[in-house]
Structure formats: C-alpha cells, structure tokens
C-alpha cells in the first residue's frame, strides 16, 4: 500500500463557505427560527387553513391514538405500520373526496414521489406544469420517464406534448392550486385533453383539500372529476387538516399497485398513529362544519383587498415585491408588528418575483383580522 501523503488542498467541504457567502450577498440565506408555543403572533405563514392544528377535537384525536397505538408506527406499512386507524382514515378520506380508494403515506412529498415513480418509469412520458411543486419536480426526475415541462396552465402545450409522444404510457401532472400564486389549474380542460390522448391525469390537491370545492372536497370535486377512472389525486394531511402525512386517491387498481411498487410506501416507516388520529379527527370536523372552506375564502379576499392584489380562488394570497431583500425586510417588519407572513425568494420563485405569501385561516377572529389589516397597510410597503 502506498503511503498516505498529506496535501495542501483545501478541506473537501470548504466550498460551502463560498456558496453561503454568495447566498448572503444575494439576500437568499435561510435560517431556522424556533417559535414559542404561545407567542403573541398571528400566523399567516403556515398552511393551517381551517385553524384545526390546535383545535381541541383534533388534539384529542392525536392523544387518543397515541394512547391506543403508541407514539410511533414501529415499521413500514407492509410490516407493522398499518393499524386499524390507518384503514379508517383511508376509507373516510376516499369517501369524502369521492374516490374509490385511498392510501396513506408518511408525507405529501412521499405520496407524490411514490405515485409518479410507480405509474411511470422508462418508456413512459410525463407532461409536467412548469409551476409544479418541488415534490412533483423531484418525482419526475426520479421516475426515469421522459419528462416534458410545459408553460403554466397551458392546455394547448399539454395537448401538443401528448400528440407528439412515442411512449405507450403517459401522465399529465399538475397542482390543482398553485402553492405560490394561489391560482387554479384548468382541470376540466386538462382532463379532456388527457382522456382524448390516452393519458392519466395526476392532480396534487395539497392546497385544494379543505378549501376548494363543495364542503372542501377539492378542485377535482368542483370540476365534476372526483372519482374519474383516469384521474389520480394526491393530498396532504398537513395543511387544511392540521396534521401530518399524505395520501394517494384514485381507482382501487392504482392504490393496489402502489402497495407493490411505490418505494416511498414500501420502504418508509408508516405515518405515526397520533398524526393519523389527528387527521381523522380533522376530517370529521370538516364534514361536520362544511361552511369552514367558505370562511377561508372570505378571509383570503379580505387579505388580498388590504394588500392591493386580486382576490384569489384559494387560501393563498401572493404579494410580489420583486427583490429578495425587499421581500425579506417586509416580512420582518410584519413579524416585528406581530404578524408572521411567508417570504418566498429564489429558488422557490423565479428571479425578480420575490414575494410575501399570506395564507388565510378560517379561525381568525374579527379583532385579529383588523390587526392583520392594520399591519399589512403599514408594513408591507411603508
């Protein structure tokens, strides 16, 4: 064996310092800010649209599940991780959304990775919207399918990509509600094109469930597409339902295939019982209080009016400020005044479109909404 010779080469991770400095200079450094459990701050940065994350009924659902099943699942869904609670949530979630079947994953991210990789692969085509969430982008990359990225909500471009395909199988993939701008995908038109071209439409309803459609059943339900035999949906349990986890909904043949083929289902520890219990309790609250989604949209319209932007068809209000420094400073001013808002900078959004993202909540009191409006008027564009 040759002797080890020490060199004057830099440390193999020294490049991280230069990258961090470039990010700092561009106003793109991110940091973790632990929050106190009862800070006197109104949160418009998270995704707890229905205000169920701290609802006593939802918390009780988590506590009861922990007492009955324990704090963790102890294994994957195929080993020890599937409890009767998981099955109940899947059954009730599918029924609520109008799907034949549902399969719960440990996160919405894992659900997207699992469904796209399992339904595509080499020899398949994925047509993906340019504004899709990072989890869908990563799923396309990992799928080994040929991926064509089309302009946001461009149905003609989707049709052209499908018409030119040589692959036997094809998927069209989109968010139902864009997570940054809050606009809706033209699902009815996308479904018509997909069906005509023999493709499956895969829709991420992360920001649709609990907010859009009849009683919060999602954009697919609003467009009359819930339960269609050539549509697959994914949802998250961590936004409107105030818990954690994700699920795939669609034909029973699809979820059965995922049990055999979705690596993020097979090899991942199952969603923990407290999260399942909380999600199930939140779903039942939503079923018992079908007016909650309309209240979210009312609050979103109020926030948009105050911020000087158009009212969105969802809970997401986007206020574009341009530079990352302007967005960061505005978010900090709002926080200092007692209102936490989202600050989106590249790479989360394109260059020159850094923005504040405000997320509406159904549980805001009149006094809280008045306070928010006052802060937005004074602090967003001082």
Give residue ranges: language-model regions.
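Active-site PLP attachment segment
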Residues: 215, 221-257
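Conserved PLP-anchoring active-site segment centered on the Schiff-base-forming lysine
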Residues: 115-134
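Conserved N-terminal alpha-helix of the aminotransferase class I/II PLP-enzyme fold
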Residues: 59-60, 65-107, 300
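Active-site phosphate-binding strand-loop segment of PLP-dependent enzymes
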Residues: 148-203
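PLP-dependent enzyme catalytic core of the Aspartate aminotransferase-like
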Residues: 2, 52, 56, 60, ...
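Structural motif of enzymes handling amino- and sulfur-group chemistry
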Residues: 270-289, 295, 299, 309
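Conserved PLP-binding catalytic core of the aspartate aminotransferase-like
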Residues: 294-338, 348, 352-353, 360-362
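N-terminal "arm"/small-domain region of PLP-dependent enzymes with the aminotransferase-like
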Residues: 5-71, 199
